[in-house]
Design a protein with these regions (language model features):
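Active-site microenvironment for binding and transforming phosphate-containing groups
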Residues: 4-305
């Protein structure tokens, strides 16, 4: 098995491991989160890969759990969302979370107008938009959060890349959409891969490994445990390779290189916890004047549930 590097000092001091881009640790009010140095250069952008720190949830959900669906108390989850909204000065109704169904469907949100009327219409694992003042969110607890930004056209995309979505090459699909629909140039697309389960902790069976065998350069992220039907899968590495295979320059890619399973002091981990845990939020938003608000659904907390 591959050992996870000790990252507590680089995380706290901002010093990078040799040859790696280290995300910055930021504390805003009680909320602790990470920023990509690459994306931080885009002055039109707000982004955060949140940790589990700074909320009010308890026990397995301590403390900044943002999921209403994992068994936590609804009041505490809503309190956590309100803390995030206050820390970033973003009204709660401007956050949007999709349902995340472990597929490769992409929700494209136009700059103006309505885009959903029921939660069932939000069964997607990626969002692409050029709408301002809409914080598009991905929930994670081991899966890979991938952010894309067209730094010239001011278009953003957030991707939930678990192993199934990664096997479907969802990151590559989003890049193709940016280039074909919006005319994004490959040199203008930036990518940031957030904290996720590392290859140090992600042993999979042959059935899961089979889903990646046809991917180009899979020797970089899929490793056989010789003499067994077990494999080591580097999910962040698989998505990085998809991005490179789309001809995005290597210098346009940031990787957090933090394992959520090893660092359960900082992150929720489904595998590391045995399955009972919360979810951290990862989000991006294009700054600017908010478009005319359109009421789309009658549920009390429709955008974040």
């Amino acid at each position: 098995m591959v050992e996870c590097p000790s990252l507590i000092q680089p995380l706290l001091t901002g010093k990078a491991n040799e040859g790696k881009s280290m995300f910055r640790s930021v504390k805003n009010h009680s909320i602790e989160y990470l920023e990509s140095p690459l994306l931080s250069k885009c002055d039109f952008l707000t982004h955060a890969f949140c940790t589990r720190l700074g909320g009010v949830s308890e026990n397995e959900y301590a403390s900044l759990n943002i999921s209403f669906k994992e068994g936590d108390e609804e009041g505490k989850v809503l309190h956590n969302w309100n803390r995030i909204a206050m820390a970033f000065a973003i009204p709660l109704e401007q956050f949007l979370v999709v349902n995340q169904v472990h597929g490769d469907d992409v929700l494209v949100i136009p700059p103006y107008g309505d885009f959903f009327s029921t939660r069932a219409e939000l069964n997607h694992d990626a969002i692409v938009t050029n709408r301002t003042n809409l914080a598009v969110c991905i929930k994670t607890a081991d899966c890979v959060p991938v952010f894309f930004v067209d730094r010239i056209k001011k278009i953003i995309a957030v991707v939930h890349a678990g192993w199934r979505s990664s096997a479907l090459e969802i990151s590559a699909k989003v890049i193709r959409l940016l280039r074909e629909k919006y005319g994004s140039a490959k040199q203008d697309i930036l990518a940031a891969i957030g904290p996720a389960i590392g290859r140090c902790c992600f042993e999979v069976d042959g059935t899961t490994a089979d889903a990646f065998f046809n991917q180009k350069n899979n020797e970089e992220f899929l490793f056989s445990c010789f003499g067994t039907n077990k494999w080591i899968l580097d999910l962040a590495g698989a998505n990085r390779r998809q991005i490179l295979n789309c001809d995005i320059p290597e210098e346009n890619i940031d990787v957090a290189d933090l394992c959520t399973s090893c660092r359960q002091d900082l992150f929720f981990s489904h595998r590391g916890s045995g399955g009972i845990t919360g979810r951290q939020v990862n989000f991006m938003m294009i700054k600017g004047d908010a478009p005319c608000r359109v009421l789309t659904i009658g549920d009390e907390y429709p955008r974040i549930q």
